[in-house]
């Protein structure tokens, strides 16, 4: 992908506006997870090191535009950045008509979603952001799939628009996995429903050699192959779709599964009741009417791990079982360790996937972990991300 990169620009004495994703959880004024802030720090530090006057902007939560509330303020983030950077980071609330700032200084602009027109990508608002700077740096991959005034709009109107290091790294990794993948490529797509991952499955079926499915998605594929799935989550109206995907790409199906008796499961306390349920390994042809499939079986996990061993590119989106409960997590554990041991390039994304990576402590063995959420999925689906498209356009 061809786009301007912040790291290639001379930022000395330039006014630089960096759009980061600093949307962190805040409880009683305290930041409860600083992962996104830690990820953004190197970009800010790199701009300061070049002698730029740095303005940072972000959204936080989902405020009503034009109605700022203290609990949705970026004040705790400004305090965090001051400590982390070792210099004062002022929070500016009134900045749209101009910001007084000197090279080597950094300020944080208050929650962009307090501004009327932010989410609708209002052109006048976007032009005001653009007028603040000599260089606009888009570094928030997690919001790149939304055309908003502080993302797509500011990039469109700024004198110079570039991708920050975080965004550039993400796009390079996604390009490597999806646009120029080294073959053989294997994708793991798991989740409760085929319907929510249909575009992902369809897109990946065009580029990968094997498509491993898990969770409720696998149940629909098992049903399409004529197996009884008992009381398992399954979308019968998408059986023909599953058949069409399986006709296009190799979809290795589970040969054994881990089930529980559905009559023992309290759906109001799903995970709690699963912790007490008996986990039984069964061949797929032996699934009974009351069985609920909650993981792939040991033989299947071993077979899938063998497939992953020979892959040169692996894309992982979704755990293959209810890994939050240990007796239904062995399949996900086996696959996560196989991905970690693979010599191929691996990329993983999606909230549940990140939780599994944390649980099985394989983060440092995955080639690239995307924090993009919805943006990651839309990129995998082959959709155009507005804030990326404008950077390509302006390159």
Curated annotation (Swiss-Prot):
Keyword ATP-binding: yes
Enzyme class, UniProt record, top EC level: transferase
Short name of one Pfam family: PGK
Record pathway: Carbohydrate degradation; glycolysis; pyruvate from D-glyceraldehyde 3-phosphate: step 2/5
Annotated GO CC locations: cytosol
Compartment(s): Cytoplasm
EC numbers: 2.7.2.3
Reactions it catalyzes: (2R)-3-phosphoglycerate + ATP = (2R)-3-phospho-glyceroyl phosphate + ADP
GO molecular function: ADP binding; ATP binding; phosphoglycerate kinase activity
Positions that bind substrate: 21-23, 36, 59-62, 113, 146
Superkingdom of origin organism: Bacteria
UniProt-listed Gene3D superfamilies: Phosphoglycerate kinase, N-terminal domain (3.40.50.1260)
Record note on quaternary structure: Monomer.
Family: Belongs to the phosphoglycerate kinase family.
Protein's name in the database: Phosphoglycerate kinase
UniProt source species: Acinetobacter baylyi (strain ATCC 33305 / BD413 / ADP1)
Gene: pgk
